[in-house]
Amino acid sequence: MKMIRRQALSLLAGLAAAVTLPLGGMAQAQTMPAPLDNPGEVKIALVRYLSTGDFFQAYLSGVEQQAKALGVDLRVFDSRQDAALQADMVDQAIALGVDGIIIQHGLTESMQEAAQRAVDAGIKVVAFDVNVENKAIPQVEQSDYLLGKLALEQA
């Protein structure tokens, strides 16, 4: 189990980075995470703030495909733009004993304390497009400006 926990952060970063590749290739994972000894024992929670629209459906599809390819147990929590519910869902993921949490979007004010509770519980956390203002949590972000500029250049 110790080996699994050490690899959870690499897995989370890989999942978060992998889903952005089909969306324009702007972000690329530098290295793939090492294979897991017992991937079925790894539980990852994706806690979403935004879920409607093509981008968010493609993002979810990418996370699900990557989790399936790695053989990990993925739990998806969808707060539907309810900041308090998203924070509660992080707490639910902590209670489930997940190995890692991907926080997808959200509000800094509501996610800061929830993310810290996960870190305090020994859970690896990655934040995608939400600044939780925590040096222990890797941030995966994209520039909407640069994506828009690229789209216009390719049109």
Q: Where does each model-flagged region fall?
A:
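N-terminal secretory signal peptides and thylakoid transit peptides that target proteins
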Residues: K2-G14
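Flexible loop/hinge segments that line or gate small-molecule binding clefts
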Residues: T108-L146, L150
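Boundary at the C-terminal end of the N-terminal hydrophobic targeting segment
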Residues: A27-T31
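Hydrophobic alpha-helical segments within soluble ligand-binding/sensing domains
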Residues: D37-N38, Q86, V140-A155
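Bacterial N-terminal signal peptides
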Residues: L12-P22
